[in-house]
């Protein structure tokens, strides 16, 4: 490949044997005499955490363990699980007091099955059909509505990632197929999309490493970076770039190489014969939840930077997970902790886990904010949805469910805002508004929506002391 001018097409790729490396947005990709595009493409990252929140309990509401007391802009996060987002308050919109009604039991035989139904509802806001067969039925998820409209503009329309085991098949419990628990992305009401748990698999998919599983395995045995395969192409490209583009390219390539090193360390340890906390996990899956989540966030940030895909869904845990999070300060398993028996001390212990999970999000936001995107940054042009389809997990209800939006969505969200929905408002109303802001404006209803929720205006009736 020889570049004869400083102008590059946006889809310029560096290709080598079994590798296709997309590039970040560079000044050289803007034709001479033109300015950066006025409306950068929006990215979407949907992050689900199961088991609701301590702040959705009666005690949690009183103590503002999730939603802050003040509605509007003068809110205090010091007592909230959202406190790790305080440095990012100008980038977040908290939407409290919404319900996920479609996750409730509609029939007597569905009672008690919330763990096996809820994740299918999060991004679809649709009530899943109770079946253990292949005739599953839920709804098209928010991320896939966006992917169908705009996903074909990128090499990969969308990607689905997860942390825990999501490859179970057949029926799980209470008459529900495991797929309802395994994924949050649905291409249609009958098409659940598989989620990728192994960071190495996600990396290989993003960077076109190997056409077959055998080719990818063989390349890993070579123990060299994908950048080594395209070294000559990188060198030729650099000659045609200005100083700013060279620095941007170097940062991008350094991030790729660092992720590769981390993946190699994980694989080396997991194949060393040392005992593992997750002995049944694929070789590329870290035992450390923290490292696993950060690798997945790093991959999303890289993909957004290079416009490989603009759409991710990310499942941080499997419903009914008993995983212990040592860094949270709680020694209880996630599921056991969520069944706190309405005891205040146990609710506060569960809140430690909620706070720990939220504490992972600033890592992602920092990556996005530090990634240039035209004359702005990627976080400015991204919507991150973080939430849960459960409210108080002790009683398996779906009221006052956690939901926070991050990023400015290309100016459509202003941040530094807490909005409290009227009692009985469906989370689907929020998602319908988000779909329209994402450009999917021909969708008239979503799940059990009854209208659109205004995401920028504080109601005149809101007071500084309003309870979240």
Describe these PLM feature segments.
Residues 1-468:
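Ligand-binding pockets and gating/stacking loops
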């Amino acid at each position: 490949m020889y570049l004869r001018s400083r102008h590059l097409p946006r889809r310029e790729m560096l290709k080598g044997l079994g590798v296709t490396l997309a590039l970040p947005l560079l000044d050289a990709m803007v034709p001479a005499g033109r300015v950066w595009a006025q409306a950068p493409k929006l990215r979407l990252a949907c992050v689900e955490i199961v088991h609701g929140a301590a702040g959705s309990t009666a005690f949690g509401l009183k103590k503002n363990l999730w939603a802050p007391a003040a509605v509007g802009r003068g809110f205090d996060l010091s007592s909230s699980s959202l406190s790790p987002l305080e440095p990012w308050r100008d980038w977040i919109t908290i939407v409290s007091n919404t319900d996920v009604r479609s996750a409730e039991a509609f029939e007597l035989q569905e009672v008690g099955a919330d763990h096996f139904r809820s994740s299918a509802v999060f991004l679809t806001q649709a009530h899943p059909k109770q079946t253990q067969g292949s005739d599953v039925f839920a709804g098209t998820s928010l991320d896939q509505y966006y992917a169908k409209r705009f996903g074909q503009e990128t090499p990969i329309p969308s990607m689905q990632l997860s942390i825990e085991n999501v490859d179970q098949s057949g029926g799980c419990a209470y008459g529900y197929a495991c797929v309802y628990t395994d994924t949050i992305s649905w291409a249609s009401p009958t098409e659940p999309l598989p989620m990728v748990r192994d960071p190495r698999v996600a990396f290989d998919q993003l960077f076109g490493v190997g056409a077959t599983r055998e080719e990818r395995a063989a390349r890993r045995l070579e123990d060299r970076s994908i950048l080594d395969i395209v070294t000559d192409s990188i060198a030729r490209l650099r000659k045609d770039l200005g100083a700013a583009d060279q620095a941007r390219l170097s940062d991008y390539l350094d991030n790729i190489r660092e992720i590769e090193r981390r993946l190699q360390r994980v694989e080396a340890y997991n194949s060393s014969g040392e005992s593992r906390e997750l002995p049944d996990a694929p070789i590329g899956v870290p035992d450390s939840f923290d490292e696993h989540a950060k690798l997945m966030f790093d991959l999303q940030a890289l993909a957004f930077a290079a416009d490989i895909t603009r759409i991710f869904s990310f499942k941080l845990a499997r419903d009914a997970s008993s995983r212990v999070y040592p860094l949270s300060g709680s020694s209880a398993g996630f599921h056991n902790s969520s069944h706190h028996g309405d005891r205040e001390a146990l609710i506060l212990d569960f809140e430690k886990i909620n706070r720990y999970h939220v504490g992972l999000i600033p890592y992602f936001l920092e990556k996005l904010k530090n990634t240039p995107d035209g004359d702005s940054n990627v976080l400015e042009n991204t919507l991150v949805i973080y939430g849960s389809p459960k409210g108080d997990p002790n009683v398996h209800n779906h009221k006052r469910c956690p939901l926070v939006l991050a990023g400015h969505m290309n100016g459509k969200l202003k941040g530094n805002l807490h909005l409290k929905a009227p009692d009985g408002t469906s989370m689907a109303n929020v998602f319908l508004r988000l779909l329209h802001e994402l450009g999917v404006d021909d969708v008239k209803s979503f799940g059990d929506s009854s209208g659109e929720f205004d995401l920028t205006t504080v109601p005149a009736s809101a007071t500084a002391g309003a309870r979240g």
